Amino acid sequence: MDITIQHPWFKRALGSLYPSRLFDQFFGEGLFEYDLLPFLSSTISPYYRQSLFRTVLESGISEVRSDRDKFVIFLDVKHFSPEDLTVKVLDDFVEIHGKHSERQDDHGYISREFHRRYRLPSNVDQSAISCSLSADGMLTFSGPKIHSDMDASHSDRSIPVSREEKPTLAPSS
């Protein structure tokens, strides 16, 4: 099968809002018609974008919330088990690392690895941080904020990932 290379001057109808899946974290998870023939699918039906936002919403994008009382990170890690995840607090950062060895899926064999690093607000009580993984693969990292009259404790430590049996509701802004 011959696949033409897309020239840099050729832009998709929605530009950067419509990312290609050929070279991102979806590599190896199967291709859609618009991945191979983006100009053809937009020419035939410019309003037909079956999975335009599905890939964005399911891409492992994290959401960070910092309100008056707590600091929370939501991260989609549906391809990882708690044993595959390492969560550490180092200085004023939280580091989340996931890695699983090669395993078989619908499209062949795949191994995955990611590393995310987030800066913690200075008023997060690092001794009270918790981390859990829901049944639908949403990792929730949370730490309470302390008020200015109390002193935040800072130390390097690993945070255990506990498993929850119920799915996490999709984070809403």
UniProtKB/Swiss-Prot annotation:
Regions of compositional bias (Basic and acidic residues) in chain numbering: 146-167
Binding, Zn(2+) 3: 154
sHSP domain location: 52-164
Disordered: annotated segments: 146-173
N6-acetyllysine: modified positions: 70, 99
Positions annotated as glycosylated: 162
UniProt modified residues of type Deamidated asparagine: 123
Region (Required for complex formation with BFSP1 and BFSP2): 1-63
Residues that bind Zn(2+) 2: 107
GO MF, any single term: structural constituent of eye lens
PTM info: Acetylation at Lys-70 may increase chaperone activity.
Superkingdom assignment: Eukaryota
Modified residues (N-acetylmethionine): 1
Database matches in SUPFAM superfamilies: HSP20-like chaperones (SSF49764)
Keyword Nucleotidyltransferase among UniProt keywords: no
Pfam families: Crystallin (PF00525), HSP20 (PF00011)
GO biological process, one term: lens development in camera-type eye
Binding of Zn(2+) 1, residues: 100, 102
Chief location: cytoplasm
Modified residues (Deamidated glutamine): 6, 50
Entry-annotated residues carrying Phosphoserine: 45, 122
Location within or outside the cell: Cytoplasm; Nucleus
Role, per record: Contributes to the transparency and refractive index of the lens. Acts as a chaperone, preventing aggregation of various proteins under a wide range of stress conditions. Required for the correct formation of lens intermediate filaments as part of a complex composed of BFSP1, BFSP2 and CRYAA.
Protein name from the UniProt record: Alpha-crystallin A chain
Species of origin: Osphranter rufus
